[in-house]
Amino acid sequence: MQQLNPSEISEIIKGRIDNLDVSSQARNEGTVVSVSDGIVRIHGLADVMYGEMIEFPGSVYGMALNLEQDSVGAVILGAYDTLAEGMSAKCTGRILEVPVGKELLGRVVDALGNPIDGKGPLGNTQTDAVEKVAPGVIWRKSVDQPVQTGYKSVDAMIPVGRGQRELIIGDRQIGKTAMAIDAIINQKDSGIFCVYVAVGQKRSTVANIVRKLEETGALANTIVVVASASESAALQFLAPYAGCTMGEFFRDRGEDALIVYDDLSKQAVAYRQISLLLRRPPGREAYPGDVFYLHSRLLERASRVSEEYVEKFTNGAVTGKTGSLTALPIIETQAGDVSAFVPTNVISITDGQIFLESAMFNSGIRPAVNAGVSVSRVGGAAQTKIIKKLSGGIRTALAQYRELAAFAQFASDLDEATRKQLEHGQRVTELMKQKQYAPMSIADMALSLYAAERGFLIDVEVSKIGSFEQALIAFFNRDHAELMAKINVKGDFNDEIDAGLKAGIEKFKATQTW
């Protein structure tokens, strides 16, 4: 029997070790401890960053939101039915990014930027981070250019400027989305790109909106981002940030963009759900402590940036142009309670609010804008000259009318001045009514306001105001097309335009064709 030599054995082992090819890969990996309700707890991820993407087996991704001493709480983006305890999870070193660029115009995408409209892949697009820091004060420029919504009541009394944040607030089924969609439709030929973010809505509702945008030709310059009611809370929470990043692409390159968040109440509810599942301590109305920051960091990204900012961002490729991102966030109230937690937060963040009232809506005044409570803090400087000049008495007339109407119910005999104010207020209220999907041009709006301001409606029956306005606009667009085109292009108000409008209305009233 041959005896084994220990020194030979050790030499063989050493040789084997020397020849062994081990290509080591340094990576931060952990183990899934629990999976429930779209939340995953992971043990062993030592170097993970807040908001970092975490990769699970089967190309499932999550986002780290809770960094604790011995574990990490992450929220899953998408389906998580393939995940189980004991699976591995590894850091990617990247934060969440979504596709951006003009290739997205006319498309419907989910919160992660994946197309869901059946029109094929997006093609070559850039990507950008979902969470970004808003431009600093030095890089901003004051708001002095208008965004025409096409609504008389808004453009005359609560004007919106490029780079402004104007809240649309009111109860459910009162016309908030209709107002925002009309504002998007009105940008069809204005050169403003639009982003519509639908959060927690029914898919059928979103499909109807997309169809309407397509019919009116507004979808071609609009991006629709959808996180419907059937999507996870994580995607509903992320959708507004993703839409904002897509809008910032235009702002940072010297273009103008408009973004509608429909609505931020549902985003706050989704974030509350995530926070409670992550075992964060609840605060008022069970919302987490940072729900104000949730909305402030989103809405601060809407701004008007200076020429220097655009030039610096594009490395000198674009010069002498300012960029803007205008935000129209929507908040749904419960029984008109604007003093609830989320509504008061968003009111304090934004530059004004358009308050829609149930009582007005139910009485047939649509859009149901309450002129007394609605305000635009910075839009006045951006208002078109002719609209600004002619709308001065409109808000006063409406406010006085509402006050006097309540008083007149108790008074039997009214003096002449009060009666005239009531009659004028009735006609102005009727004039402010407008059909859905029928945004008005500057000239059409100026004509209506001129007729009200200069007393041309006094002898028109209240019930005939609507048909009078339609006939008047049709008459001017047919017989005074040059004057209307001039108003639309310049938006100025001078003696020549004043005389032209006056003569035209007098000529129209003489025909009695309404």
Curated annotation (Swiss-Prot):
It is a peripheral membrane protein. The keyword Membrane applies. ATP binds at residues 170-177. PROSITE patterns: ATPASE_ALPHA_BETA. CDD domains: ATP-synt_F1_alpha_C, ATP-synt_F1_alpha_N, F1-ATPase_alpha_CD. Its EC number is 7.1.2.2. InterPro entries: ATP_synth_asu-like_sf, ATP_synth_asu_C, ATP_synth_asu_C_sf, ATP_synth_F1_a_nt-bd_dom, ATP_synth_F1_asu, ATPase_a/bsu_AS, ATPase_F1/V1/A1_a/bsu_N, ATPase_F1/V1/A1_a/bsu_N_sf. GO terms for cellular component: plasma membrane; proton-transporting ATP synthase complex. The record marks 374 as: Required for activity. It comes from the Bacteria. One of its GO terms (molecular function) is proton-transporting ATP synthase activity, rotational mechanism. It catalyses: ATP + H2O + 4 H(+)(in) = ADP + phosphate + 5 H(+)(out). It is an enzyme of class 7 (translocase). Keywords: ATP synthesis, ATP-binding, Cell inner membrane, Cell membrane, CF(1), Hydrogen ion transport, Ion transport, Membrane, Nucleotide-binding, Translocase, Transport. It is found in: Cell inner membrane. Belongs to the ATPase alpha/beta chains family. F-type ATPases have 2 components, CF(1) - the catalytic core - and CF(0) - the membrane proton channel. CF(1) has five subunits: alpha(3), beta(3), gamma(1), delta(1), epsilon(1). CF(0) has three main subunits: a(1), b(2) and c(9-12). The alpha and beta chains form an alternating ring which encloses part of the gamma chain. CF(1) is attached to CF(0) by a central stalk formed by the gamma and epsilon chains, while a peripheral stalk is formed by the delta and b chains. Produces ATP from ADP in the presence of a proton gradient across the membrane. The alpha chain is a regulatory subunit. This is ATP synthase subunit alpha. It comes from Pseudomonas putida (strain ATCC 47054 / DSM 6125 / CFBP 8728 / NCIMB 11950 / KT2440).
